[in-house]
Structure formats: structure tokens, C-alpha cells
Swiss-Prot record:
Entry keyword set: Calcium, Cell membrane, Disulfide bond, Glycoprotein, Ion channel, Ion transport, Ligand-gated ion channel, Magnesium, Membrane, Metal-binding, Phosphoprotein, Postsynaptic cell membrane, Receptor, Signal, Synapse, Transmembrane, Transmembrane helix, Transport, Zinc
Predominant place of localization: membrane
Tissue/organ expression: Detected in brain (at protein level). Detected in brain.
UniProt organism field: Mus musculus
Protein name: Glutamate receptor ionotropic, NMDA 1
Organism placement in taxonomy: Eukaryota, Metazoa, Chordata, Craniata, Vertebrata
Length: 938
């Protein structure tokens, strides 16, 4: 009997245990709904989920309450009616009320404190995306800011690039603005203007007047119903709701009071099933059921808290369950596919695109979550237009930014009266100048501030032409930082911003860049370039080595060794001619014995002959007579002809033509490819050339060298080349060729590389880009660009000299004139020597003649005395005495000069030797004359 009882007890225990193991787990789901009707819908949705997922071993249990008008009451109800039931999640609706009494905020705060997930059903406010406030909040609808994605897609479909964003300065407006700006940034675009107003403001006229002055005609509005109504009324008064305008708004802006004042033609959005609370209840229950099933398959799952009892009752599995919910993908939803993003908002949502026609909203398209599908034939645009507005108006007042870069843009200070000085081009036409504001770099030493200045040049003439052709006015200013534009890091972060003219254009400070801006890929990613108005490349500027002529420049054709050999040859040949003619038996060609010896070739004549043949001066006398000497003379003449011809050819090369200089051969020159501190080259900082060298891997070595020496502007670098501080400057060929043509000490060298062009820069969304390119192409065709090129770029001063026939100057031939002057001085010096020598020789001859005359008289007198003749004639006696006295005084003067000489130099000894024989004879004669005279007197 006891055994039977034991078996019965075991059977009952096993059956109860099996029943417990087979029973599904009860999962409570809470809900805070707007009405009792929606509570019933919630319970039905839970039952449908249990039937649909009966095999999941879970059973959902519905626990719900309705909204309370008081936040404290609502929080207490959540604790007492829902959390106390150990709910895994709470669904909450957001019924529209005038003062928004039925907000889900108390539910979100209370459940979030205990980490219980909350699923919003119709809550659209963007504040619930902030997870620092609403920690566990998810929703099956997107926030209002999600409408920015639809606006952005409509901009893409209709090619609207000019927009004005008009938003209220509250959380909703800022969220919409942030999302739209993020999308525009991905498209490398931006709103032309963002206008904000305070919520509840009653006067937005000034704000709309500012919008009316902009180019954009597409206005995107994000505001509450009442604020939207205020904007619509002001826009109607300013005639901003008519033809040409486009108004894109969201769901609030075409609801309630806003719809009463909304203009016909406005385009709004309505979330499909956005207010269908029952549909969202069904989808939310399905998402929770799927997430609970996934959660229970994990380990270490704890049950939700039972009631609101301090902070020790926080659900530890709550954050995990929230992550499971956020990763859920519920494809069978009534409202479509349900997924959540990282903020817990619904990722994909469908919208109806509504058009207000005759005060009624008409659906004219849909947004399927990724693309806009419009029905253009049904759309009536503002002003009753059926054609899509272009979305902008052509502003007739453009802000032009440029940069000082001659010859494209000259910058000069204005006169005292604020006007520009009148000047004329090389063609005699007046220079067209415009007033441009910018830093006063033209006044060194003065404080740097913006002042009116005069701008003119190639680009200014082009701007005037474009303005006249396309009917716009302009105001010109110089770029503030003096740079063309490159990207640089902001505060050492990864974010980069453009500086220079590029930065001013992209930031809206300028509408157009009219300057020698190089077209390159990096810039073209951010701005729109026109067709090139000037094709060019990069080249290298160096200083020209001007040859300096010296006094011995006429001797440069021959080396000093050759000159020495030529001079030696002249004298050797002269001596050989003299010797050959002297020793040749036929050298004198004496016809008879009476021919004088002076007719023969002397050494002096031989020298004259040798120099005369070499210098081609003609031979008047002293030609060799012997055949052997004449053979040598002919050979010497041939030698002289070759020497003179070679000298003449080389003289022209040295004096007339420029010497070939050792310049840079181009970008591949070894001095550039293998940089050193002995050869410095550079370009302009943060320019297109700098970008080019930085991007080219094969030029990295050159870039590292240049980076240390780059200059702030091209003008500074060019001056550094002239001052020998920089050996080579790499820059745009158009600019450097012009500088080399104006400054004759500079020259460009090497072939062009990195060929590109100069273009006019505009923003990507500029309405002028097509017209500007067409105008430039027409200017090329009709020769206007060629005329500008001749007037400004090809106007040269140095080339006219270099292309003219080369002529010799006094500087080249100064040495020759000095040679002539030296010959004159030498001739004058020698003539004095010749005169002195001649006088000395004549004095000696006269003395000899007197001596011989005295001797003859004495001899005659002596013969007369021996023959016994009478006393000599008194006249003869007087003559004899005069001769003897003259001779005596002459001899005395010679002796006194001899005694006063310094020790009897070598010249005196030689003179004594030359005159020793006749002097002794004269002395003997003098002694005899004195004896005769004493004898006669006695």
C-alpha cells in the first residue's frame, strides 16, 4: 500500500514539473495610450502577437493606462500600474493637445531611471533623440528634423542649389538646421543664408526683407504652427509668395493654424501613418515581441523591477534589452519596415509630398525612405506656375575678389581727391581703372588697414567686359590675407579650411574670383571654374648675367699665350728677313758700284715689313729683295691672313654676341633635383605651385627644400632674385615672362611644365558659371583676349633690345681706343727722344766740321809759310782766331760737363770712347795753333 502511494506521488510530481517546463514565460508589456479605445487596440495587438509567435515559448501580457494631464500623476501611474507589474517595455503615445498636456516626458523620465525601454508611438519632437535626457527612449516614427532628408532629396531632384533656411531658434529648428547642413556638407554645398527667429515672435518682416535681397528663391521653413503662420503673413505682404519663389515646409507648417495662412503653391510633407496610433501600436508590439524572444535566448537575464523603490531597483538587463530593441529589424510592420538608428529614431519613413492648391492639400509625390518620386504634372507652384522655378534670381550686384599680381592686376593708391590718375596704354588708349578696397600694401610703413585703391590690368579689363556683356554691376576688393587659396588645418585638428580668395568665395564674402587663379583639381572640387581666359604653365625665373666689357676685351679672342707667340713671331720673322736679305748674294741687286747701301733691307725696314704684313697696313718701302727672303715673306703673309681672319671672327663673337650662360635647363636640372644650400629656389606659400610640388611624389625632395625658402608673394620673390638672395623662382609662366620683359636683369629659362590655365572662380551653385564661360569663349573667338594679351602681357621693353641687330658700344671698344691713346703717348715720348738725339748729333757734326775747317786753315797757312809767302791776310787771320776760340770754348764746356758728371757713368765712358780719336787730333791741332799764334805775336 505504501508502495502504491509512493508511485502515485512520483507520477504527480513529474507531471507538475513537465507542465512547469512546458508553460510559456509571461512577459508583461506596458502602455500609456490616449484613449480607452487605443487600450483595447493594444490588447488586441498583444493577442495577435501571441498567436503569431506561439512557438516562441513566451506569452505577452498587456498592461495599460491612459494619459494623465498632470506630469506627477503620470509618473505615479507608471510606477504603480506598470513598473509594479514588472513590464519589459512601455509603449507611449503623444496625442495632440493645445498645450501639449499629454507629453511622454514623465513616462520617459520614470522608466528611463529604472532602465526600462520606452517606445514612443507618435512622438515627433527632436528633443527625444537626446539620449543624455531620454536615456531609454525609442520611437516608431522619425523626428521632425528627419524631414531635412526629404528637403535635401527634393533639392537634388529639382537641381536647386540656392536655398535660404528659415528656422525658429529652438531645439526643433536647430536640429533641422544641423541635419540639413550636414547633408549639404556631404554634397560640398551650403545654404546661401540661415535666418533664425525667436519662437513666438510677431514680426519677421526685417528677416524676410533680408532674404528677399539674396539670390536664392527656395525657402525652407522649420517652425511651429503659430510661427509658420506669422511668417506666411509677412511673406505675403512682401510679395514673396508669388512667381519664382519655392516654399518647402514640413508637417507642422501645413497643419492647424498655419494652413490658414499658407500660400498656394507651397510644398509640404506628411508622414504616412504618422498619426495612425493603432498602426504604430501594432508595430511596436511586434518589435517588442521579437526583441524579447532574442533577449531570452541570452544568459544571465534578470527580471524587471517590481515597483519604484529607490535606485537599488534598477533593471540590470535593461540596457541590454534596449540594445536588442535598437538592433531589431521588423519587416512586417503595418507602417512599413521598422528599424532604429543610433538615436533610437525610426530609420526609414515614408512621406506624402503635399501641394496646397486652392486652399486644399493635394498629394503630388511620395518619399519612399530613400528617394523622392514627384508627379510634376500635378504640381502648381507659387504664382500659379506649372513650370518648375529655377530657384534663384540673377543678382545684378556682384562682390568681386582679386589679388595684386602684375600684369593681371595692378594696384596703385588713389589721388588726394579719391580718384585714379589717368594713364594710357602702349596703344594710346586710356587705362580702365576701378576702385578696389583692400589692405594698403602700396604704402610701406603705414598701418595695415583697408583703404580705397586703384586697380587696373588684364583682369580688370576682362571684368569690365563681362559686366557689360552680362549686365551686372560689381564692387571689387583685394583679398585680405594676400593669398590665392589653399587648405590649412584649423587649430592643429583634422578639419581643413580654405584661406585666401578661395576661402572668401566659399564663405560668401565674394561672389566671383577675377584674378590669375590657376585651375587645378584640388580647387575644382570645391568651386566652379570658367573656361580658361589665359593658357600658361610653370617656368623658372633667374637673374641674367650681364657681360661686362673690360679694357682688354679686344684681346679676349686669343689667349695670352697665343698673343705672346704672335708677337714673338713678328720679331723673329723680321730678324730672319733681315739676315736672309743681308747675306744673300742677290740681296742688294746692285746694278753698278755706285748704288748706295741705304737702299738695301735694313733691320728697321724688316720690322716695318713684318708688322705691316700682319696688320695689313701696306708696304711702302723696305721690301726684301732676295728670293729666299721673299719666300719667307709670302709664308708670313699667309700666316698673317689666317691669324687676322680668326681674330676677326672671334672678336665678333666676343664683342657683339652674348656669351652662352650656364642657366637652369628646366625642372629636371641637377641643381633643382639635387638641392643644396648653395643654390636656393622657391615659390609662393600656399599657392597652386606649392600644392603641385606637395602633391607630386617625385618632386618631394624639391618641395622640402622649397618649403624652407618660400615667399609670401610673387613680388617679394622676384625682388629677391634681383637682389641675389634667391637663385631661381618657380611661378606662372605668364607672370614671369612679363617680369623678364620689363626687368632686363631677369630671364626665364627652361621649358614650360605643369601646363594649365587661369580661370574665373565661382561657387558650385553660382547661376553665372555658364554665362561667364560662354562670354570668355566668345572673347577668344572675336580677338578680345588677344588684344588684352598684347596690351598687358606681351608689352615688352627688353626684348626690343635683344632682338635688334647687335651693335658695338664704346664700352666694347674702349680698350682699342686706349691702345690708340697709348700709341699717341708713346709717339710723343719718342719724338722728344728723337729731337734730343738729333740735336746732340747735329752738335757733334758741327764740332767736327769746325775742327776740320780749322785744320784746313792751319794747313794752308803752314803751306803758305813754307813756301815763303807773305803774312796771311788779316781777314783770314781773324777767321782763324774765331774758329780756334770757338773750338776752345766748346772743348772747355765739354770738359766742365764731364767733370760735373757723377763719377763718369757708363754713358760718359762710352761717349769718351766714341770721341777719343778725333778729340786727341783736335787737341794736337789746338796745341799747334796756340804755338803758331804766340810765334806770330812775337
Amino acid at each position: 500500500m505504501s508502495t502504491m502511494h509512493l508511485l502515485t506521488f512520483a507520477l504527480l510530481f513529474s507531471c507538475s514539473f513537465a507542465r512547469a517546463a512546458c508553460d510559456p514565460k509571461i512577459v508583461n508589456i506596458g502602455a500609456v495610450l490616449s484613449t480607452r479605445k487605443h487600450e483595447q487596440m493594444f490588447r488586441e495587438a498583444v493577442n495577435q502577437a501571441n498567436k503569431r509567435h506561439g512557438s516562441w515559448k513566451i506569452q505577452l501580457n498587456a498592461t495599460s493606462v491612459t494619459h494623465k494631464p498632470n506630469a506627477i500623476q503620470m509618473a505615479l501611474s507608471v510606477c504603480e500600474d506598470l513598473i509594479s507589474s514588472q513590464v519589459y517595455a512601455i509603449l507611449v503615445s503623444h496625442p495632440p493637445t493645445p498645450n501639449d498636456h499629454f507629453t511622454p516626458t514623465p513616462v520617459s523620465y520614470t522608466a528611463g531611471f529604472y532602465r526600462i525601454p520606452v517606445l514612443g508611438l507618435t512622438t515627433r519632437m527632436s528633443i527625444y533623440s537626446d539620449k543624455s535626457i531620454h536615456l531609454s527612449f525609442l520611437r516608431t516614427v522619425p523626428p521632425y528634423s528627419h524631414q531635412s532628408s526629404v528637403w535635401f532629396e527634393m533639392m537634388r531632384v529639382y537641381n536647386w542649389n540656392h536655398i535660404i533656411l528659415l528656422v525658429s531658434d529652438d531645439h526643433e529648428g536647430r536640429a533641422a538646421q544641423k541635419r540639413l547642413e550636414t547633408l549639404l556638407e556631404e554634397r560640398e554645398s551650403k545654404a546661401e543664408k540661415v535666418l533664425q527667429f525667436d519662437p513666438g515672435t510677431k514680426n519677421v518682416t526685417a528677416l524676410l526683407m533680408e532674404a528677399r535681397d539674396l539670390e536664392a528663391r527656395v525657402i525652407i521653413l522649420s517652425a511651429s504652427e503659430d510661427d509658420a503662420a506669422t511668417v506666411y503673413r509677412a511673406a505675403a505682404m512682401l510679395n514673396m509668395t508669388g512667381s519664382g519663389y519655392v516654399w518647402l515646409v514640413g508637417e507642422r507648417e501645413i497643419s492647424g493654424n498655419a494652413l490658414r495662412y499658407a500660400p498656394d503653391g507651397i510644398i509640404g510633407l506628411q508622414l504616412i501613418n504618422g498619426k495612425n496610433e493603432s498602426a504604430h501600436i501594432s508595430d511596436a508590439v511586434g518589435v517588442v515581441a521579437q526583441a524579447v524572444h532574442e533577449l531570452l535566448e541570452k544568459e544571465n537575464i534578470t527580471d524587471p523591477p517590481r515597483g519604484c523603490v529607490g535606485n537599488t531597483n534598477i533593471w540590470k538587463t535593461g540596457p541590454l534589452f534596449k540594445r536588442v530593441l535598437m538592433s531589431s529589424k521588423y519587416a512586417d510592420g503595418v507602417t512599413g519596415r521598422v528599424e532604429f538608428n543610433e538615436d533610437g529614431d525610426r530609420k526609414f519613413a515614408n512621406y506624402s509630398i503635399m501641394n496646397l492648391q486652392n486652399r486644399k492639400l493635394v498629394q503630388v509625390g511620395i518619399y519612399n525612405g530613400t528617394h523622392v518620386i514627384p508627379n510634376d504634372r500635378k504640381i502648381i507652384w507659387p504664382g500659379g506656375e506649372t513650370e518648375k522655378p529655377r530657384g534663384y534670381q540673377m543678382s545684378t550686384r556682384l562682390k568681386i575678389v582679386t589679388i595684386h599680381q602684375e600684369p593681371f592686376v595692378y594696384v596703385k593708391p588713389t589721388m588726394s581727391d579719391g580718384t585714379c590718375k589717368e594713364e594710357f596704354t602702349v596703344n594710346g588708349d586710356p587705362v580702365k581703372k576701378v576702385i578696389c578696397t583692400g589692405p594698403n600694401d602700396t604704402s610701406p610703413g603705414s598701418p595695415r588697414h583697408t583703404v580705397p585703391q586703384c586697380c587696373y590690368g588684364f583682369c580688370v579689363d576682362l571684368l569690365i567686359k563681362l559686366a557689360r556683356t552680362m549686365n551686372f554691376t560689381y564692387e571689387v576688393h583685394l583679398v585680405a590675407d594676400g593669398k590665392f587659396g589653399t587648405q590649412e588645418r584649423v587649430n592643429n585638428s583634422n578639419k581643413k579650411e580654405w584661406n585666401g580668395m578661395m576661402g572668401e568665395l566659399l564663405s560668401g564674402q565674394a561672389d566671383m574670383i577675377v584674378a590669375p587663379l590657376t585651375i587645378n583639381n584640388e580647387r575644382a572640387q570645391y568651386i566652379e571654374f570658367s573656361k580658361p581666359f589665359k593658357y600658361q604653365g610653370l617656368t623658372i625665373l633667374v637673374k641674367k648675367e650681364i657681360p661686362r666689357s673690360t679694357l682688354d676685351s679686344f684681346m679676349q679672342p686669343f689667349q695670352s699665350t697665343l698673343w705672346l707667340l704672335v708677337g714673338l713671331s713678328v720679331h723673329v720673322v723680321a730678324v730672319m728677313l733681315y739676315l736672309l736679305d743681308r747675306f744673300s748674294p742677290f740681296g742688294r741687286f746692285k746694278v753698278n758700284s755706285e748704288e748706295e747701301e741705304e737702299d738695301a733691307l735694313t733691320l728697321s725696314s724688316a720690322m716695318w715689313f713684318s708688322w705691316g704684313v700682319l696688320l695689313n697696313s701696306g708696304i711702302g718701302e723696305g721690301a726684301p729683295r732676295s728670293f729666299s727672303a721673299r719666300i719667307l715673306g709670302m709664308v708670313w703673309a699667309g700666316f698673317a691672313m689666317i691669324i687676322v681672319a680668326s681674330y676677326t671672327a672671334n672678336l665678333a663673337a666676343f664683342l657683339v654676341l652674348d656669351r652662352p650662360e650656364e642657366r637652369i635647363t628646366g625642372i629636371n636640372d641637377p641643381r633643382l633635383r639635387n638641392p643644396s644650400d648653395k643654390f636656393i629656389y622657391a615659390t609662393v606659400k600656399q599657392s597652386s605651385v606649392d600644392i603641385y610640388f606637395r602633391r607630386q611624389v617625385e618632386l618631394s625632395t624639391m618641395y622640402r627644400h622649397m618649403e624652407k625658402h618660400n615667399y609670401e608673394s610673387a613680388a617679394e620673390a622676384i625682388q629677391a632674385v634681383r637682389d641675389n638672395k634667391l637663385h631661381a623662382f618657380i611661378w606662372d609662366s605668364a607672370v614671369l615672362e612679363f617680369e623678364a620683359s620689363q626687368k632686363c636683369d631677369l630671364v626665364t629659362t627652361g621649358e614650360l611644365f605643369f601646363r594649365s590655365g587661369f580661370g574665373i572662380g565661382m561657387r558650385k551653385d553660382s547661376p553665372w558659371k555658364q554665362n561667364v564661360s560662354l562670354s570668355i569663349l566668345k572673347s577668344h573667338e572675336n580677338g578680345f583676349m588677344e588684344d588684352l594679351d598684347k596690351t598687358w602681357v606681351r608689352y615688352q621693353e627688353c626684348d626690343s633690345r635683344s632682338n635688334a641687330p647687335a651693335t658695338l658700344t664704346f664700352e666694347n671698344m674702349a680698350g682699342v681706343f686706349m691702345l690708340v691713346a697709348g700709341g699717341i703717348v708713346a709717339g710723343i715720348f719718342l719724338i722728344f727722344i728723337e729731337i734730343a738725339y738729333k740735336r746732340h748729333k747735329d752738335a757733334r757734326r758741327k764740332q767736327m766740321q769746325l775742327a776740320f775747317a780749322a785744320v784746313n786753315v792751319w794747313r794752308k797757312n803752314l803751306q803758305d809759310r813754307k813756301s815763303g809767302r807773305a803774312e796771311p791776310d788779316p781777314k783770314k787771320k781773324a777767321t782763324f782766331r774765331a774758329i780756334t776760340s770757338t773750338l776752345a770754348s766748346s772743348f772747355k764746356r765739354r770738359r766742365s760737363s764731364k767733370d760735373t758728371s757723377t763719377g763718369g757713368g757708363r754713358g760718359a765712358l762710352q761717349n769718351q770712347k766714341d770721341t777719343v780719336l778725333p778729340r786727341r787730333a783736335i787737341e794736337r791741332e789746338e796745341g799747334q795753333l796756340q804755338l803758331c799764334s804766340r810765334h806770330r805775336e812775337s
